[in-house]
Amino acid sequence: MKMINKLIVPVTASALLLGACGASATDSKENTLISSKAGDVTVADTMKKIGKDQIANASFTEMLNKILADKYKNKVNDKKIDEQIEKMQKQYGGKDKFEKALQQQGLTADKYKENLRTAAYHKELLSDKIKISDSEIKEDSKKASHILIKVKSKKSDKEGLDDKEAKQKAEEIQKEVSKDPSKFGEIAKKESMDTGSAKKDGELGYVLKGQTDKDFEKALFKLKDGEVSEVVKSSFGYHIIKADKPTDFNSEKQSLKEKLVDQKVQKNPKLLTDAYKDLLKEYDVDFKDRDIKSVVEDKILNPEKLKQGGAQGGQSGMSQ
């Protein structure tokens, strides 16, 4: 989740400075970090050098993570987190390769597990605050398969066909599928230029509204379960789309809910900042440093600032 991940950052030594800060830092002996014959290094000096935004972000994150752990530790299953890690290890070709990839991002296996646990706490928080019904999930999701004939964006492209040829081929495939829809998967495996889904008989899994090309989405959500579309043009090429029966809806429901919550937060960051504010109030959070409080309120808990940051920054770190 992009906006949440922007707040789940490694806490640097700058957070430790707050322990030495009162309402304002002065150059008194109590605020001296290092002394020498050449002069002292104070909390105020160091905070000025590091920057209050970074200190506020780090300290807020540390505090937030402690609160979330206290509130949701009994709801997060470590076994599921271990299963996530095992899945990632397989994707990277084994434990050693996975841990090497982590090291390249400055992470250890333990730190990565801690990050997954923190992300799980955030999911629990948002699940508490943002209610989504089963009917809403069904309304906003559709299980689908497709056959794609790619259109070349330029003549030198190795993949795809010219627009006219691609359309003609897609129309021929659509006629073949319409004669016997039960062969959709077999034909998708043979003809689709989307190699990822072609290996799975064209299966895309569940598609959410707002997740894909608008023309593709419009055509898909018009279909009844089991129906096959006419040829649909999108920014990728020409598709034949099949609406699959959601026989596994109950097992996929929680994952779909989390994705819909993420979409809602992306569209309306106030949902996230309000959830944080409620949490701070519940735990009687008191900012001892006025400057830190100002940064947290004006930037971190400001939905407009968070939205700008989410648009400019991407999700860093390894995929889950």
Swiss-Prot record:
One of its GO terms (cellular component) is plasma membrane. The keyword Lipoprotein applies. It is found in: Cell membrane. Keywords: Cell membrane, Isomerase, Lipoprotein, Membrane, Palmitate, Rotamase, Signal. Residues 159-198 are annotated as: Disordered. GO terms for molecular function: peptidyl-prolyl cis-trans isomerase activity. It is a lipid-anchor. Its EC number is 5.2.1.8. Residues 139-245 form the PpiC domain. One of its GO terms (biological process) is protein folding. Belongs to the PrsA family. Plays a major role in protein secretion by helping the post-translocational extracellular folding of several secreted proteins. This is Foldase protein PrsA. It comes from Staphylococcus aureus (strain Mu50 / ATCC 700699).
